[in-house]
Amino acid sequence: MKIYNTMSRKKEELKTITPGEVKIYACGPTVYNYIHIGNARPLCVFDTFRRYLEYRGYKVRFVQNFTDIDDKIIKKAIEEGSDYKTVSEKYIKEYWTDTKGMNVREATVHPRATENIDEIIDIISTLVEKGYAYPVSNGDVYFSPSKFKEYGKLSHQPLEDLEAGARINVEELKKEPMDFALWKGAKPGEPYWESPWGNGRPGWHIECSAMVRRFLGKTIDIHCGGQDLIFPHHENEIAQSECCNGVPFAHYWMHNGYINVDNVKMSKSLGNFFTVRDVAEKYGYEPIRYLMISSQYRSPINYSVDIIEQCKASLQRLYTCRDSLDFALQNAEDALPDNAEETKKSLLSHKERFIEAMDDDLNTADGLSAVFELVRDINSNVIPTSSKELLIFAKELFSELTGVLGLVYEEKDNDLDGKVEELIAARTAARKAKDFAKADSIRDEIAAMGIVLEDTPNGVKWHKK
């Protein structure tokens, strides 16, 4: 398997520290609001990556944090007349609702910044002792990128170029423009923790370094996140961690592309900002997941009403295939057609193409294409045979590949199924009695439920619109 490494700017063969095992850290959300569709992309992409690694036989330890103390959280707490704990707990709960809806599995561990203060203080203390960081009079502690000769190696920007665009705010006491806060001295009314430098709270970048070291170790296999995190967040993580621990921080860096809305980059200031909840209420959660993995993960994705509708339609093709297989199995026969082995080989060729695509830097776009080729093959060459063995073989293969992508996870609604089957039986009886007005009336009733009927030689098939 090859993955594109942002550090080297090329695809590299995946070689893990411990053969057969993968240690991955993904930057999680700052929990002060509902997650937006930009947040959804890394969640769905790296969940799919994890699923695929497990599918290929790796044991995956996947850690994703919650930033539960931050300027934005404090501001939100003031706006709502509450406290940072209430705000973070509220939006972590909402996060679980949205991720469950998108079929994003829980990480192995979901550490919170506030539960790792001791580890954070320990790393900062080491950096101060080694001369990479320094405390100032107001209780802040700053890191000096100029002391780390490899600073800029991830974003491929020399420190002098970065310094040219940096500014110092009047209230900051740092020595150089690029210095960044590891610890922030307490301000009146803000939450704080005790430290050797006085009461305060951690900076954003140090939180991830601490949680990586505690839950995965000093060196990990893969660190991932959005392209917007390459600089300064991931660059600063590398500097802190490598200066503290004296070993490489991560062997591979994976970054997903941006989300555009109607071909314009999504931003609150432009008013083209959508939460996952907003979109899910109109279109459901699964089309969001489908959209997020419909393009190669490093390329940008465009969100629009037309595109999300296309995603719904594509998903419906997958659900129709699943339901058609189930329907065909109800009347399946034990007899095997003469070309059964040839048909199985054809079906397996789509699996081979799927693996080839996913092995090539998680190319989910080509992976999906292979799944739809499988669907066409099933519809043309499996379902018409009514062969029980072939139908089961096809269904298991279909479920295997869609499961890796985290798709087709909605269970059948048994109550709805029963009601629809009851109406179909009544319609069939009306047609036999030549009461076509009643049959048409029942068909209209079924259509009003969002169900499409298809009359076939083997009976009536149906699916949701």
Predicted segments, located by residue:
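Alpha-helical recognition segments enriched in aromatics with Gly/Pro capping
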Residues: 1-32, 47, 97, 118-326
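Short phosphate-binding/catalytic loops that engage adenosine nucleotides
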Residues: 58, 132, 451
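The substrate-binding groove and active-site-proximal loops of carbohydrate-active enzymes
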Residues: 78-84, 108-114, 198, 226
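Short, glycine/charge-rich beta-strand/loop segments that flank catalytic centers
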Residues: 66-70, 92-95, 105-120, 138-147
